[in-house]
Amino acid sequence: MLKAVSADVSALTGKKQAFLLQVLPDGKLLVAGSDSHGTAYGIMELSCLIGVSPWEWWADVTPEKKTSFVLSAEYQTLQSPSVEYRGIFINDEDWGLYRWSKNNYEKERGNFGPKTYAQICELLLRLQANYLCPAMHDASMAFHRIPENRLVADS
């Protein structure tokens, strides 16, 4: 596909989790990543450019409606992380996240599981993070005890 659009993505070579957003001479927008994380981060960066907050779900930040979105013909950004591991540690989840999720979001499970972790993993992608130390208190059940959690995290 890259040959078909005559795009030079050599700047991505040798970089981990890097992405390139570039308006091509024909006006098409190229989103390319050095790996799957890089590609996802590029898509999420585009989402930020159009006004979607990484916290849109968690903080009820509704994106402002726009009638159009335009990037300049010269637009190009190449980004790669300067820190290898970037992420979050879910600590003391039994005081907040666990109770909220079991009472509001995953009532059928009575715990938090794949639906909640799907939102956590999306937030990680939106924040260009790659590391999650999941919940493990007895109240919330350890991450690995619910097989669907891993499927969500790997997708």
What positions do the PLM features span?
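Aromatic-lined carbohydrate-binding surfaces of glycoside hydrolases
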Residues: 2, 82-155
